[in-house]
């Protein structure tokens, strides 16, 4: 008998739920992150914030900016900077594709979540995104409210 492996849920360290409201999400990418030991330990506590973080190309490499990973309490003087730029590990073609979309099409590379994969490595889910206007946000909010009201009406009648 062969045993089936059940896929373990990914341990999400940080989630950018606001990005799906503020941006129209396009293609997504998975990237590795270069972290120090205290950053990894701090990420495992689940207190990181990526609400305002974005990725940008610099000298042919992708960097993650403005991601907040709090100091690890047990590290005392060997701690890391909380908002330092972190290098992202992507293939050259992916970096070129992201750079082209940012320069030519006016898109932004947004971090959607940071998680640990099956091997315990920290990964960032990036997305090519285009900013929404205020009226688009209001329209999305109205649609969401209507869907909720419709579900409530169907539940009460049925």
Curated annotation (Swiss-Prot):
GO terms for biological process: trans-translation. Pfam families: SmpB (PF01668). Residues 131-158 are annotated as: Disordered. The lineage of its organism: Bacteria, Pseudomonadati, Pseudomonadota, Alphaproteobacteria, Hyphomicrobiales. It comes from Xanthobacter autotrophicus (strain ATCC BAA-1158 / Py2). This is SsrA-binding protein. The keyword Nucleotide-binding does not apply. Residues 136-158 have a biased composition (Basic and acidic residues). The gene is smpB. GO terms for molecular function: RNA binding. Keywords: Cytoplasm, RNA-binding.
């Amino acid at each position: 008998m062969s045993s089936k492996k059940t896929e373990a849920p990914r341990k999400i360290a940080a989630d950018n739920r606001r990005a799906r409201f503020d941006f129209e999400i396009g293609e997504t990418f998975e990237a590795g992150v270069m972290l120090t030991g205290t950053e990894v330990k701090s990420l495992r506590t689940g207190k990181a914030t990526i609400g305002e973080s974005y990725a940008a190309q610099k000298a042919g490499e992708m960097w993650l900016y403005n991601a907040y990973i709090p100091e690890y309490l047990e590290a005392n003087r060997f701690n890391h900077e909380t908002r330092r730029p972190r290098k992202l590990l992507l293939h050259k073609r992916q970096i070129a594709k992201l750079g082209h979309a940012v320069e030519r099409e006016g898109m932004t590379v947004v971090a959607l979540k940071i998680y640990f994969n099956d091997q315990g490595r920290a990964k960032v889910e990036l997305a090519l995104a285009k900013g929404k206007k205020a009226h688009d946000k209001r329209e999305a909010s109205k649609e969401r409210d209507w869907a909720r009201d419709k579900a409530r009406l169907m539940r009460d009648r049925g």
